[in-house]
């Protein structure tokens, strides 16, 4: 004797199967949002009280004032330069760029320079910049990833002060708001100096040449694999 499946029972079973499928799909979505399926790697510069202990002052003469603070988005660094030229930096592993060639930078400019010519020695100051490269006393090969209100993004030059240093403008933002940039620093260092590594990173806000006062902020600075 053959038994036929009731249409009602068939519909109920199909509905249960659909509900279970949707539950599983939602679980996968939540899992991917929380944990992600990416193998992306990141190395962050820490501006917390503990992280600040790892940053060393770089430069000579009258010192730029650097202070850290936090808001609802986390820790940030404030830089105030008034005829000063020093930075904060740390040594990093030379192998880092092999896995994490990208540098992510978020900053904002509260008070910028009046009209200066950053292509000359007298105007060669930057409200906000990140320095990378082969840092050493003799024969250094450096790149400054800089903000400029006077030069276009993508502008690249040899520093008027130092043959082994390059200035690369990554931001021309004049909004006064937080903004972020991502740069493949491994490719940039290969292009400018023929090296594919950096042994340090430093934030550097200076105004010693123009003798003007500037205020800038940095946050969320990190190397990443993608």
Regions found by a protein language model. Name each.
Residues 40-59:
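Extracellular carbohydrate-recognition regions
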Residues 67-87:
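Short carbohydrate-recognition loop motifs
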Residues 47, 219-223:
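Extracellular beta-strand elements of beta-rich domains used
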Residues 1-22:
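N-terminal secretory signal peptides that target proteins for export/translocation
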Residues 25-34:
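Bacterial N-terminal signal peptides
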Residues 92-103, 122-123, 172-175, 195:
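Extracellular/lumenal carbohydrate-interaction signature centered on repeated Trp-anchored short motifs
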Residues 125-130, 163-215:
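Extracellular beta-strand ligand-recognition surfaces/modules
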Residues 110-174, 214-217:
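Extracellular ligand-binding interfaces
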């Amino acid at each position: 004797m053959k038994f036929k499946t009731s249409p009602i029972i068939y519909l109920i079973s199909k509905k249960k199967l659909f509900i279970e499928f949707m539950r599983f799909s939602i679980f996968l979505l939540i899992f991917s949002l929380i944990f992600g399926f990416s193998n992306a790697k990141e190395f962050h510069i820490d501006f917390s009280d503990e992280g600040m202990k790892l940053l060393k002052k770089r430069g000579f003469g009258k010192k730029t004032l650097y202070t850290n603070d936090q808001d609802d988005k986390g820790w940030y660094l404030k830089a105030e330069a008034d005829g000063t030229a020093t930075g904060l930096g740390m040594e990093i592993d030379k192998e880092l760029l092999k896995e994490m060639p990208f540098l992510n930078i978020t900053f904002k400019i509260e008070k910028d320079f009046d009209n200066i010519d950053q292509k000359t020695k007298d105007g060669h100051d930057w409200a906000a910049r990140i320095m990378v490269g082969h840092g050493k006393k003799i024969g250094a090969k450096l790149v400054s990833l800089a903000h400029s209100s006077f030069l276009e993004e993508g502008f690249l030059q040899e520093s008027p002060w130092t043959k082994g240093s390059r200035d690369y403008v990554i931001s021309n933002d004049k909004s006064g708001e937080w903004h972020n940039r991502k740069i493949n620093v491994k490719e940039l260092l290969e292009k400018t100096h023929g090296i594919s590594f950096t042994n340090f990173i430093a934030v550097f806000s200076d105004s010693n040449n123009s003798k003007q006062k500037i205020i800038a902020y940095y946050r969320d600075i990190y190397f990443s694999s993608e």
